[in-house]
Amino acid sequence: MQLEYTVKGGGILRGFTKEDIAYALYELSLAPSSCFQDWLKDTASRINVQFGYVIRYQYPHHFVDDLARHGLIMRSV
């Protein structure tokens, strides 16, 4: 079953796993990093500075879960 998330601003992300969703965010990022794992860590750090949210970045599915928990992305039904 395909997952679908909406980001603030209306963009739609689709994938079969939460890792696919995290990677789609990485590909759309305006703050690229040399590798996906570095991007997860750097993005989690930026979110913490901007909003005070703690976003786990060690595993992509935790990253997506935390973004959704804080309302930064929304799972479509």
Regions found by a protein language model. Name each.
Residues 25-56:
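Acidic, aromatic-enriched beta-alpha/helix-loop junctions
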Residues 52-77:
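Short, compact, well-ordered microdomains
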Residues 2-3, 45, 64:
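Exposed boundary/loop context
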Residues 1-31:
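N-terminal acidic leader/helix
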Residues 21, 43, 66-67:
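Short linear motifs in intrinsically disordered/low-complexity regions
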Residues 20, 35, 39, 62-63:
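Exposed alpha-helical structural elements
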Residues 16, 48-49, 61:
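Protease-labile, long low-complexity intrinsically disordered regions enriched in Pro/Ser/Thr
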